[in-house]
Swiss-Prot record:
Record-given protein name: Fluoride-specific ion channel FluC 1
Cytoplasm is among the record's keywords: no
Keywords: Cell inner membrane, Cell membrane, Ion channel, Ion transport, Membrane, Metal-binding, Sodium, Transmembrane, Transmembrane helix, Transport
Family: Belongs to the fluoride channel Fluc/FEX (TC 1.A.43) family.
InterPro entries: DUF302 (IPR005180), FluC (IPR003691), TT1751-like_sf (IPR035923)
């Protein structure tokens, strides 16, 4: 909770500065119409719609969404300023009251349209970013590899034992080394195990069926040329990005990240 509060405070500070900048750039009209407040609120609505759409498409993390969406946009657009501007404008005269009513109406309608426009812009941006990912995401294959203190066979046994103790299913094991031997080829010890929680996996496939290509979870224990043993697993968070999972998959992905991390740490450790 404290980390969320800190992120909101930081974002709010930047938002307040952004708001002041906008209000300096857009002074009120001569008739007292608070155009500066209106512009600040509409800009905030557009940006909030954009970051929300990007977050739904897994373009940025929850922390980024908190600091920009909740914190910064909350600092840019405040209801208190909107209400104060309306009251001050309405109290001047009857004609000013009508202007105030128009201001309230325009603010609500413009804010609604700005949010929709921002969400559309965010969706289009997400499509482009998914189509042309940054170089870092191309280089990052989504694999997490840790050194194991055990043999390949024992590492896989420890994966199976820990997964079962956490209520997961162990679906199958594939001994690639044995397969290579049958084919008359040489391959250092290499073994795959497939495990997972059908409940979490089903939630993810209900969101995007293509993630079934990467489910259940796969863990590969393998020995390198120097005799060291490694355990490699898919990063669930990367899988969420790969398949463009939405907000409905958040809880299941977090559970998968925690579960995979726990199993990996146990299997490779003491």
């Amino acid at each position: 909770m404290l980390d969320i509060i800190i992120l909101v405070v930081i974002g709010g500070a930047f938002g307040a500065m952004t708001r002041e900048f906008i209000m300096l750039m857009v002074p009120p009209l001569t008739d007292g119409f608070p155009l500066d407040i209106l512009v600040a609120n509409v800009v905030a609505c557009f940006l909030l719609g954009t970051v929300t759409a990007l977050y739904a498409r897994k373009i940025h993390s929850r922390d980024v969404h908190t600091i920009i969406g909740t914190g910064m946009m909350g600092g840019v657009s405040t209801f208190s300023s909107f209400a104060y501007g309306s009251v001050v404008l309405a109290s001047a005269s009857m004609s000013a009251f009508l202007i105030a009513a128009a201001y309230v109406t325009v603010s609500v309608v413009a804010g609604y349209v700005a949010v929709l426009a921002g969400m559309k812009f965010g969706e289009k941006s997400a499509d482009i970013l998914h189509r042309y990912p940054p170089m870092a995401s191309i280089i990052d294959s989504g694999l997490v590899t840790v050194e194991s203190r055990h043999s390949v066979a024992e590492t896989i046994e420890r994966v199976a034992a820990k997964a079962k103790s956490m209520g997961m299913n162990v679906f199958t094991r594939v001994d690639h080394g044995a397969g290579a031997k049958e084919a008359g080829l040489g391959l250092p010890p290499t073994e795959l195990i497939i495990f997972g929680n059908p409940q979490n996996g089903t939630v993810l496939m209900q969101d995007k069926r293509t993630i079934g290509l990467d489910l259940p979870i796969r863990a590969l224990a393998w020995e390198d040329g120097s005799g060291k043993v490694w355990l490699t697993v898919n990063d669930p968070a990367w899988l969420a990005q790969r398949h463009s999972l939405g907000l409905s998959s958040d809880v299941a992905i977090k559970a998968m990240v925690t579960g995979t991390g726990t199993v990996t740490k146990y299997a490779a450790g003491d």
